[in-house]
Amino acid sequence: MTAVHTGNINFKWDPKSLEIRTLAVERLLEPLVTQVTTLVNTNSKGPSNKKRGRSKKAHVLAASVEQATENFLEKGDKIAKESQFLKEELVAAVEDVRKQCDLMKSAAGEFADDPCSSVKRGNMVRAARALLSAVTRLLILADMADVYKLLVQLKLVEDGILKLRNAGTEQDLGIQYKALKPEVDKLNIMAAKRQQELKDVGHRDQMAAARGILQKNVPILYTASQACLQHPDVAAYKANRDLIYKQLQQAVTGISNAAQATASDDASQHPGAGGGELAYALNNFDKQIIVDPLSFSEERFRPSLEERLESIISGAALMADSSCTRDDRRERIVAECNAVRQALQDLLSEYMGNAGRKERSDALNSAIDKMTKKTRDLRRQLRKAVMDHVSDSFLETNVPLLVLVEAAKNGNEKEVKEYAQVFREHANKLIEVANLACSISNNEEGVKLVRMSASQLEALCPQVINAALALAAKPQSKLAQENMDLFKEQWEKQVRVLTDAVDDITSIDDFLAVSENHILEDVNKCVIALQEKDVDGLDRTAGAIRGRAARVIHVVTSEMDNYEPGVYTEKVLEATKLLSNTVMPRFTEQVEAAVEALSSDPAQPMDENEFIDASRLVYDGIRDIRKAVLMIRTPEELDDSDFETEDFDVRSRTSVQTEDDQLIAGQSARAIMAQLPQEQKAKIAEQVASFQEEKSKLDAEVSKWDDSGNDIIVLAKQMCMIMMEMTDFTRGKGPLKNTSDVISAAKKIAEAGSRMDKLGRTIADHCPDSACKQDLLAYLQRIALYCHQLNICSKVKAEVQNLGGELVVSGVDSAMSLIQAAKNLMNAVVQTVKASYVASTKYQKSQGMASLNLPAVSWKMKAPEKKPLVKREKQDETQTKIKRASQKKHVNPVQALSEFKAMDSI
């Protein structure tokens, strides 16, 4: 390795190395490599008995190689003449290429004259290798000349930063800053170009991070240096200036190392390196448990698997013992760890029983499935433990900062020091939780971003504290105030970046489940505080509820931006709007009234029931949002504890409960349906699969049309959605909990069917074709009939009886009838939509009009969906029923219309 220190520029370069570090060199070298390889491979089958002679193809290829090399020489000469750096090395490299080119030309000519000679082929291959090495070295030298140019610019910036830090007067400071800014901008452009060309992803990330720090911190160094000059007696300003200068030095080193594609001396230069350790360990463990029984050896596999599992359990135990982990969550993690241990022992026993066999037995396959399920359950509890931390820590993240700033503005240095400790602990907690979220995430790119953001937040924390201490020392100083505002803004911006990054690597389903439980806890604390007349506790807890609700709304709204607009997003956004526009204002009003009543002397009476109702509505609003978000999840994606097990156990212990029949006899009808025996569940699943086929037909039908001017399509979608909820109920899933909910849903379908009947008859009345008219009326009669059937079947009697010591669940026949009626209705709706369109076209042809012009019925093809500029990747998206806009296959209107050609026969 040669280190060139020209003008204190640390230029690391190994003259013997032919390692290609940039994409540009690869691109330039590729055509020549292809041509040389093609020439070398010409007639490569060895000696031939055919008549010897000249090879036209070889001569042509040799000429093309010669031409390509001449192009390199021409460019190389130009680079060597124009380059300010490595001039001698470049000239020598060009001459070496010219020499190797002549040798290659001679060897290729001889080979072309006698392509069957192995000796001449060998000579040409050696000449080709030497030529490629010479050209590669020339390109690498040219590349390093560019790097040297960047390092010279980097040295200018580094010197400028030092001059800015050491400026003795404000005038000198202004001059130095004005001179430095264009140099930093120039460096940023050069570094960005280099970043794009680097082959190694780690070096690209390192360059990007260093550029960001440089761009952000140069203006801050100017402000900090200015404050030092105006208030030389305030030590906090000097400390801040030195911290920022140190960060800039690290950024300069980072750019230098990344540009030369060398390893960093400091691990902190790679804040985004690595993935989720615990997630990786669990994934690796899941792979390790699958072994060929023929090669299984207990002595080899048992210690290895047990050691891996204990390492995972140690990581899980650390998470369980953390301060933010709830007691019930800690117990569940411990239980899952024990279950995983037991599952591993059972699996190893099965492997021992299968040792030496060619194929795995059913018992062994079951043990593997059980082991995988237990690790999946442990993952789920760890994810939710992380979400406990995220939900608590990333709540009202600006409060410690605002308190610190307020104390600084008042000039109270003692308070500032106290609040600085609180602020530091808060920052450390954010960083700790962010790293916890990383440990259980499989999103490698997301983890990099979180760790990079956390690293920058950690560096910013002492700077914010120093700015507050400086303001407390000079509270009247305008510069001190501006300095504080600058750091406050930087902190808030960085926290937002970290929050969004953490949200990207965590599951929205886990977030909503945990937020729902936390809000329920807080709601009950609020009620208790009200009953105990604890004003501070009431106000503080109510603030936490408002913060949690606002966070839920923000996260869910951001998530919906990733989906194409449709029924699903409309329902979710409708639930968020209800919470933000109606529920939360009412809750805030009740809290303010309660605080005012309790704070007055003497305390004024207030309506406790009103407060409890407002609090309950907050919980219900969060729950409704969560149910709306989960509507598109498949049963496999939903947690076992999503509704039943957590819901009823938790709510039965609380002081705030809804007064519906969901808790009568301890279980809802939906929960009872979930307890059906496997045989009966299989029968229902068969019916549901048949129903899903009809639903797919309806989805295909309505997706063709723009529903903005067509109430028939709108009604069809609504009926489909409600029928899906009803069939989900029969499987113990979905938002409908009891028979009363199902009956209510059936009534809604009947109302929609009645409206569709009215619209359909209007179309039929205008249709001149009697056959089409009769078909449409027949389908409308079917809708009325099946709506009536569905209404009858909706009265599902789900009961649990104890017969002979065995629990027997009734209601299967009713459930089967319900699904069958829904399937029949779905089919009738599909046929009605088709017949309505056909009848409309007949009317158009008869009257010679562009459209039917009926109110609320306009048949227009649905416009292609807009695609987002940036697609956010999500894991396990393949099973999602509603696809992302960027993934959805759009239907060709001409193709869609062609499907109606057969409809004339209806």
UniProtKB/Swiss-Prot annotation:
Biased composition, class Basic residues, residue ranges: 881-891
UniProt GO cellular component terms: actin cytoskeleton; adherens junction; catenin complex; cytoplasm; nucleus
Protein name: Catenin alpha-1
Modifications made to the protein after synthesis: Sumoylated. Phosphorylation seems to contribute to the strength of cell-cell adhesion rather than to the basic capacity for cell-cell adhesion.
Compositional bias of kind Basic and acidic residues: 864-880
Annotated family: Belongs to the vinculin/alpha-catenin family.
Example GO BP: cell-cell adhesion
PTM annotation (Phosphothreonine): residues: 634, 645, 658
Residue segments, region Disordered: 864-894
Glycyl lysine isopeptide (Lys-Gly) (interchain with G-Cter in SUMO2) crosslink, residue number(s): 57, 797
Organism: Bos taurus (Bovine)
SUPFAM superfamilies for this protein: alpha-catenin/vinculin-like
Phosphoserine carried by residues: 264, 268, 295, 297, 641, 652, 655, 851
Keyword Secreted listed: no
Alphabetical UniProt keywords: Acetylation, Cell adhesion, Cell junction, Cell membrane, Cytoplasm, Cytoskeleton, Isopeptide bond, Membrane, Nucleus, Phosphoprotein, Ubl conjugation
Stretch list, region Involved in homodimerization: 2-228
Annotated region described as Interaction with alpha-actinin, given as residue ranges: 325-394
